Design a protein with these regions (language model features):
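Feature marking well-ordered beta-strand scaffolds used for ligand recognition
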Residues: 1-117
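Soluble extracellular-acting proteins and domains
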Residues: 79-189
Length: 189
């Protein structure tokens, strides 16, 4: 999923989902309102940054604000949890273009699944089958257990799935890569 933050000099913060670049959508915003109700006074945010699970907004007049996303119809608890797992390196510099990666973790797979469900690209039954497998994987991984049978089920569960849009193809591809990684962890545990 491709989400970006935008700061507004005379306003607040907008959060957009541009996964489908031909149809970007605002999914969240924050705005304190004007500094002065009558006079035009410089305000708003210089910039916003996502780092380590939080959104930092540097205000022109009012200082620093720190935000945390909450689940909504636009972003699920799994997607937020997966975003918090993203590795951006140990150095924070918003001007860098670091490669971001996610671990092979069931919550990351669940985030991909939530996106496919939201776009109506997967049936409820297929989604529930995968959720059941992911629940089993969480238990085994927490116990440092192994299961070649579960690993194989995770690798093959989406083989019969097909999607109709480029965006959904990307989401399904990402899900399959994470499932392969979880499978490898279940064999190597």
């Amino acid at each position: 999923r491709d989400i970006f933050l935008q700061a507004w000099y005379q306003g607040g913060i907008s959060i957009f989902d541009f996964t489908d670049s031909s149809n970007p959508r605002e999914i969240a915003f924050f705005d304190r309102g004007p500094i002065d109700d009558e006079a035009l006074v410089s305000g708003g945010f210089w910039s916003t940054y996502w780092y380590d699970g939080k959104i930092y907004g540097t205000g022109i007049v009012r200082g620093l604000d720190v935000f945390e996303l909450l689940p909504s119809e636009h972003i699920s608890e799994n997607e937020i949890a997966a975003a918090k797992l993203a590795s951006q390196g140990n150095i924070f510099n918003p001007q860098q273009q670091l490669k971001v990666s996610w671990p092979a973790n069931p919550v990351v797979a669940s985030a991909h699944l939530d996106q496919l469900i939201r776009s109506k690209s997967v049936s409820v039954e297929k989604a529930q089958d995968l959720r059941n497998l992911l629940d089993r994987a969480v238990v085994l991984l927490n116990q440092k257990g192994k299961s070649e049978e579960l690993a194989e089920s995770l690798r093959s569960v989406t083989n019969s799935w097909s999607v109709k849009t480029k965006v959904s193809e990307g989401q399904l591809s990402g899900l399959r890569q994470i499932l392969i990684g979880i499978s490898e962890r279940l064999i190597a545990s």
